[in-house]
Amino acid sequence: MDQSLTNMKKLLFLIPVVLLAACSQPKVVRETVETDQITCEVTVYSPDIVRVVKYPLGGVGASQKKSYSVVLEPQKTKVKRTETAEALTLTTEKMAVSIDKATGQVTFCDAAGGKQLLQENGTSFEPRPADDPDAGRFKVSQAWTPEADEFLYGLGQRQDPDLSLRGKKVHLWNENMHIYIPFFCSEKGYGVYWDNPGMSDFEDVPGGKTVMTSEVGDCTDLYFLYDGGDMDALMASERKLGGKATMFPLWVHGYWQCRERYHSTEELCEALRTHREMGIPLDCIVQDWQYWGENENWNSMRFDNPLYERGDTMIANVHNNHAHLAISIWPDFGPLTPQFKELEAIGALLPFKTWSMTGGVKIYDPFNAQAREIYWKYLEGLVDQGVDALWSDSTEPDHFYPTKEDDDYRTADGTWRSVRNAFPLVTNMGIYENYRAKGYTKRAVQMTRSASFGIQRYATFSWSGDVQSRWEVLRAQIPSGLDYTICGIPYWNTDIGGFFNWFYEGGTDNDALKELQVRWMQWSVFVPVMRNHTSGPLTTEIYRFGKPGEWAFDEQLNAIKLRYKLMPYIYSLAGATVLEDGMIMRPLVMDFAKDRKALSLSDEYLFGPSILVHPVTEPVLTDGKAALTGKMEASFTTYLPAGATWYDFHTGEIVEGGYDYTRTYTISEIPVFVKAGAILPFGPDVQYTSEKPWDNLEIAVYPGADGHFTLYEDAGDGYEYEKGEYATIDLDWDEAQGCLTIGDRKGSFPGMLRERDFTVNVLGRTPMTVHYTGKRVQAKP
């Protein structure tokens, strides 16, 4: 009897242990909590990603909702389930998610320390009007309560001089120069993606709530991302959710010459020839609109304009001069094009006013799968003809004089107000998927004026639209790019010098415009894509601003040459972006989250892990209009984040972090600093990226701390990298030993250099050259 009781006690003791073990086995976990008004569904997608969907009782839940941006499916995950009378808590190895049973509000905490990350503070559902095309659906809203002094970033490209979102009110409705992505993240290392492609609003009330609202939805739908607080890990979570970035060809990272527009084959080829004759490095030249002829033939995707001789001569000339051709395409068509006729026949043209305003041009409906196939059928001809990159302009798209009737209009996927912000994702998806299905050997390259969360998976990057040539606009581009790329999309650029510049009397002879152009060019060395562009009739090839020997020409040329010198570093950043979900433009929160001053800065950032950039965004030589000031230099102050020692890139001076650093700069320099421990591979002097092999690279080491860098190489184009055909070499600096270790080469690819020399240049020491055969070697200069 006593033995039986003892055995029973043992069995009862084991039951909770067995139950705990069972519930902690990896599985897809989805829990539902109902209050007296709403249903709250929580789905664990992975240890670092949790989805929260809420809807009125009896409404539409997660299983019935379409997502354009999210590609991740729920993964089997170890989850601990804890339930009390007040709350249900799901805990992964990264986070704990607690649902209040009375209110349905969710609190997110760090799993390791239990620290609260973010708490919800109200969900609302306002029925759409009964006579509305979206009747039966809701205006949906979710509020949170971040800490009062917490920094928030993201929402895409806002054209705002402030990087932080605190105190901001933002209407999320894409338009030229504004790319709105409903994602925000915190200095704490968490991110929130609000999955609604329709008209939305973000509002952060100082000292109060942070609110996301969408005009149309069946439910609130958000993804909470958190991987222990590390910002690089958060970036990996974003790419896991929205898709991996693709590898762009090596040439994309060189210099692009673009203008609105080249008017003929002869004009474009002459510009390219002049670059080559003057020794101005260049990898891509761009043909803007109207190569198709008149507006009635808008975007025919053919060289119908007789001044282009069907395009074959131009394309051959570009390729024979070791350059690449990008060409403008649009999401709308003139009535004389075959695309217009086919799209009209299937009801896939949107009745909106768009650009061009004349000629009867109409936008196509990319939400219609058949329309996407028609679009590609005609675009394919340009690709087959040899065009290297597609410039997808106006992908918001342009929509002039919008009306309520326009917002009510039903696309193939729903009303315009409910889906419009997914337009750029869907149209670029159609191009990319068809491109890959055709089996082209060259990597896809798409530059698009608008974007959505996850668009990086379609070989796409954006630029900041038709910005004006003004100093305050240049200043706003810096946080615009940083808030955009922190949303998971690594590539971005601007029109160097600005697009609209008609207000500068004398054009490129105006010293004020020259100074702005030079400073914009110097900054763009440290932007993922370096592309010069302007509006007509002005032409801004760098030789338009002066002759060799004159400052406006020389400083632009020096900037372009520096870009090419940095190419091994830049292409290695590209490799890390794909292989490790890295970032090229890094807001200071990525590396200095504990430095409160660094978190508040909007005009400094890291280019890769090692280079801090502080662009000059105010005039010195001129008054910003036309008059020369007589000043040839000026003092600028840069805050250098704490926790690192820094080198002035230009002088080699060593500066401790945590302080402001002030010095005088001429027109030849902008403030650029290198972190101690950095290892920078420098390439040869070239006219285009593939001109010379990287058979003798300089490895610059900035001592003062241990350092690491991975040199990445592949064939420069093609998709073999997806099959593992690439090589990496780890470079490690041991500060105590004063030794650089060049590790064993990992991987290979056709055409790879089997041997090379490295010139190791440790600052302050005599350089030394080592021969490398793919095996580990050390250098102690």
What are these regions (language model features)?
Residues A21-A22:
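C-terminal motif of bacterial Sec signal peptides marking the signal peptidase cleavage site
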Residues V42, K94, F183, H275, ...:
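Conserved, mostly hydrophobic/aromatic
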Residues V42, V52-K54, L90-K94, L612-P615, ...:
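Short, well-ordered beta-strand segments enriched in hydrophobic/aromatic residues
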Residues T43-L90, F125-P129:
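A low-complexity, Ser/Thr/Gly/Pro-enriched, surface-exposed linker/loop concept
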Residues S67-S69, D283-Q556, D591-A593, L601:
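Aromatic- and carboxylate-enriched substrate-binding clefts and catalytic-loop regions
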Residues E83-P249, R259-E260, T265, L272-E277, ...:
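Catalytic and substrate-binding clefts that recognize carbohydrates or anionic sugar/phosphate headgroups
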Residues E270-Q290:
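Catalytic domains of carbohydrate-active enzymes, especially glycoside hydrolases
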Residues E433-K438, R443-A444, A451-F461, Y484-T494, ...:
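Catalytic core of carbohydrate-active enzymes
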